[in-house]
């Protein structure tokens, strides 16, 4: 994380296997709903950053599909094991962003590990995944079936709870996922619309009901294939 002007630490983007900052000046404070304290900040990205993240995912597609199903299974198994090993750290991230009880945060990490170990095949292609603020780690982990099918992905977490998705992508890099297979783009509507205009193959959604309509409307506006994950 980096300093964001004189405020809290800023969580950078994760694009092409590394953390990167954006030159944009719009920042969103991630406030713990229990304490009311701003834990950190995220940039509110637009079309330029969306296109950059999607290009990284597109460039990674050949090497990721080239691993074959068994190779991708191995990588996801490594990520699940690593997440299990860092379960305490991820639980703390969830507690800080969402203000949930420790038991609830720990249960979410366990559920995310189970999802990463599943053998179901999902959507293929170069995808965007919009994640809500409720159970953000579990929602981000729901990308696993698509990854297993050979998809490369740009995750757009809620600016209210972005830490877990960023940390998951960083952990995937430590597990030697090819650069660009998993990327994180921060922001809200303009970031999602940027993925659509940049030609994402499909937009996946894993979030709360209140966000479903607006995200689906953005996808429909640009004739982008839209999939709701259970």
Describe the predicted segments one by one:
Residues 1-123:
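N-terminal Rossmann-like NAD(P)+-binding subdomain of aldehyde/semialdehyde dehydrogenases
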Residues 121-230:
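Rossmann-like NAD(P) dinucleotide-binding subdomain of oxidoreductase/dehydrogenase enzymes
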């Amino acid at each position: 994380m980096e300093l964001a002007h004189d405020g809290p630490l800023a969580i950078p983007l994760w694009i092409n296997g590394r953390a990167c900052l954006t030159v944009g000046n719009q920042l969103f404070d991630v406030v713990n709903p229990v304490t009311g304290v701003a834990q950190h900040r995220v940039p509110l990205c637009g079309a330029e950053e969306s296109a950059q993240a999607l290009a990284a995912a597109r460039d990674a597609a050949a090497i990721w599909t080239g691993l074959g199903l068994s190779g991708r299974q191995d990588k996801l198994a490594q990520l699940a094991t690593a997440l299990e090993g860092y379960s305490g750290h991820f639980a703390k991230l969830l507690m800080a962003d969402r203000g949930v009880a420790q038991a609830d945060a720990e249960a979410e990490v366990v559920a995310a590990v189970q999802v990463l170990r599943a053998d179901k095949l999902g959507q293929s292609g170069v995808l965007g995944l919009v994640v809500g603020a409720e159970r953000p780690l579990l929602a981000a982990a729901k990308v696993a079936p698509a990854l297993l099918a050979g998809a490369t992905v740009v995750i757009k977490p809620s600016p209210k709870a972005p830490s877990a998705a960023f940390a998951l992508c960083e952990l995937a890099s430590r597990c030697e996922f090819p650069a660009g297979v998993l990327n994180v783009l921060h922001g809200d509507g303009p970031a999602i619309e940027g993925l659509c205009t940049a030609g994402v193959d499909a937009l996946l959604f894993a979030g709360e009901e209140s966000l479903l309509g607006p995200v689906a409307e953005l996808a429909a506006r640009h004739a982008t294939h839209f999939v709701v994950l259970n």
